[in-house]
Amino acid sequence: RGLGDVYKRQVYTDKVEAYYRKNISKKLAIEALKAVKAFYNGESFVDGTSGESLKTYIDFIVSKNNLSNIYLSQQINDKFNNSEQMLLQLNDNFVEQINGNLLQFLYTYDAIQEGVVKLKTDMLSVLSIAVDYVDADGD
């Protein structure tokens, strides 16, 4: 969020999550990532039980169709785990992080984007979900 236009190297620290309560930026980012990971893996927020999920459906489709990408579901989880590890290394205050060590913040952003690519291209392809330009918002 606080990166502004990454490709133009414009940084907007006032766009970080929890700008007015800066010491929880990292906590919110980690919780958001955990929520996406839990949804992907079919984990309940209420009692921690697991059920059917995008992961189990990917595994089913891959095995049913003898697809070569047998490790896709694990690759996606690996991206989630790597992103979380990268986030844990950041300052709790993303404004301070960006101003103090932008490069580390950008590496974390890149790690998260690798997961987005796995979800929005590889997973959708395996699940035979077509996305048109209106749905592809440029994440």
Predicted regions, residues:
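Generic detector of bulky aromatic hydrophobic side chains
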Residues: 1, 17-20, 40, 126, ...
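C-terminal catalytic subdomain
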Residues: 12-30
